[in-house]
Amino acid sequence: MALILSACSQENSPNETAVVTENAPQTTQPSEAIRIAAAANLSDVLPEIIEGYKKDKNLPNQEIEVTFASSGKLYSQITAGAPYDIFLAANQEFPAKLVDGMFKGDSSRTPFTYTQGQLSIYSAAKPVDSLNQSTLTELLKRDDKTKITIANPELAPYGESAKAYLQAQNLYDSLTAKKRIIQAENIGQAFQYAHTGNVDYGFVAQSQVTAIKATPEQFYILPADSYPAILQDGIVITDVASAADFTDYLRSPAGQAYFAKAGYLAVK
């Protein structure tokens, strides 16, 4: 069988898929396919975790289908009946809304925290490693030509935290009024805008910076206490046994090691 990845963001065609075939011999009978709806910021680390899961569990032929998109878009798909087994959001809000909505009264559907994200400033062309909160604020205030990008704060938790950070620095309203904020659909597209030079700076996930092996001068990790904590929750949607087994692996020391290596903060 295969690991199937798809994306719902604008930077990837909705119909585009990547298939990686496993040639290792089957040592354990795989369960039925696991279908995962995953926040766009997981597009780099989740495939590695899946391969680790299949190796550690002796399930080389386990089929796992992943759709990456903004958490808000995935939430809408799930409430509309999309056939997912697991929802891995980029915040705690959307899994909680499922509990209060379509899973109301079902005590077996309990969200769990699987990682904590870090917010960074990234630029493909301008050095940012010498920045701190004060100098970043001054930079964004004084340079009227500078454009930044954030993910849609209504749909993407990283965008919501970026907006909160800018509001705390009394920057958001003025930058919006001057049309200096280029809003991306999700964190994946925000990173593409910054990485390709379409904007000067991007508020991105540190995991994205780690994935491309960015040089130290290309990013600045914002202090964790300067924006709302990006605690990422998941929830098992169906009764597929392998879905619960996979989410247990996410929270295990082995799963958390993948997250830490990828630029996230491990959770217990």
Regions found by a protein language model. Give the residues of each.
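Exported/periplasmic ABC-transporter solute-binding proteins
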Residues: 8-54, 59, 72, 79, ...
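Central helical "cap/lid" subdomain
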Residues: 102-112
